[in-house]
């Protein structure tokens, strides 16, 4: 990660706001902080927050870059605000947005998994149970069914994630049940509003490929559980839900077939 970007973020924030860089993607750099943007700086808090920063891209004209950064940051903020109001859908809470400078301040989700398995995204969560030689236990089954339900609720409300990998699903330990992990969808930088079954089919296919690439030995069962949860959301919505589900699964099969052909051809 570029030290220049880290220094820019620290200069933008107050010197009394500590930030720790945790990841860098193609579009943004992600930091954690213990300071809430609207509380006094000397207010002690045990909470953690996410700061997502879209840094300037030198290959773009500065005026175009500024416009794109503002548009994309504001778009993600608006999308998160809408998703947060959907009953039963788990996404991070938006705390603050500075679209002009490319900053989002978000609720921090997840935790460090035991035995050095890293941050509690779905990928690491499944690896942890695989290492325990218990990849098909009820905890994993329930988690994957609920992952499917989250995607189903997202799609039923005509939204798509756009980058639905197992790293962008965070498992949050339930406060009331030590064996229950609640999936939350994060990183909606490529998310959108859409009614197109193609977009939704691609969303599911991207997650399927992610699970196949990192958990190939158990992927068939994992994907089956995930799809069971996904289908259940649509099936609860009567004839219309069944009709939409049939259309979506048909398109998903077509997307999957195209992906396999592409893999064979190279």
UniProtKB/Swiss-Prot annotation:
Domain Protein kinase residue range list: 16-266
Molecular function GO terms recorded: ATP binding; ATP hydrolysis activity; protein serine kinase activity; protein serine/threonine kinase activity
EC code: 3.6.-.-, 2.7.11.1
GO cellular component, one term: cytosol
Main location: cytoplasm
Subunit structure: Component of the EKC/KEOPS complex composed of at least BUD32, CGI121, GON7, KAE1 and PCC1; the whole complex dimerizes.
Record comment regarding domains: This protein is considered an atypical serine/threonine kinase, because it lacks the conventional structural elements necessary for the substrate recognition as well as a lysine residue that in all other serine/threonine kinases participates in the catalytic event. BUD32 has protein kinase activity in vitro, but in the context of the EKC/KEOPS complex, the catalytic subunit KAE1 switches the activity of BUD32 from kinase into ATPase.
PANTHER family: EKC_KEOPS COMPLEX SUBUNIT TP53RK (PTHR12209:SF0), NON-SPECIFIC SERINE/THREONINE PROTEIN KINASE (PTHR12209)
Record's protein name: EKC/KEOPS complex subunit BUD32
Organism, scientific name: Candida glabrata (strain ATCC 2001 / BCRC 20586 / JCM 3761 / NBRC 0622 / NRRL Y-65 / CBS 138)
């Amino acid at each position: 990660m570029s030290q220049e970007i880290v220094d820019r973020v620290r200069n933008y924030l107050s010197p009394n706001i500590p930030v720790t860089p945790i990841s860098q993607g193609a579009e943004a750099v992600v930091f954690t902080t213990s300071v809430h943007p609207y509380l006094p700086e000397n207010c002690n808090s045990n909470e953690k927050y996410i700061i997502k920063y879209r840094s300037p891209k030198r290959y773009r004209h500065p005026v175009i870059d500024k416009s794109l950064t503002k548009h994309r940051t504001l778009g993600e903020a608006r999308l998160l605000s809408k998703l947060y109001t959907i009953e039963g859908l788990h996404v991070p809470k938006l705390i603050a947005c500075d679209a002009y400078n490319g900053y989002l301040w978000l609720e921090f989700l997840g935790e460090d998994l035991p035995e050095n398995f890293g941050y509690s995204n779905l990928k690491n969560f499944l690896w942890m149970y695989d290492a325990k030689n218990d990849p098909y236990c009820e905890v994993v089954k329930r988690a994957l069914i609920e992952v499917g339900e989250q995607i189903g609720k997202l799609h039923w409300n005509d939204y798509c994630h756009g980058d639905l990998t197992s790293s962008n699903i965070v498992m949050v330990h339930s406060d009331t049940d030590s064996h229950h992990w609640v999936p939350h969808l994060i990183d909606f930088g490529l998310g959108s509003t859409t009614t197109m079954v193609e977009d939704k089919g691609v969303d599911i296919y991207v997650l399927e490929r992610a699970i196949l690439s990192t958990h190939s030995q158990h992927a068939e069962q994992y994907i089956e559980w995930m799809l069971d949860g996904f289908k259940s959301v649509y099936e609860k919505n009567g004839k219309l839900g069944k009709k939409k589900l049939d259309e979506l699964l048909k398109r998903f099969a077509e997307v999957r077939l195209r992906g396999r052909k592409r893999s064979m051809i190279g």
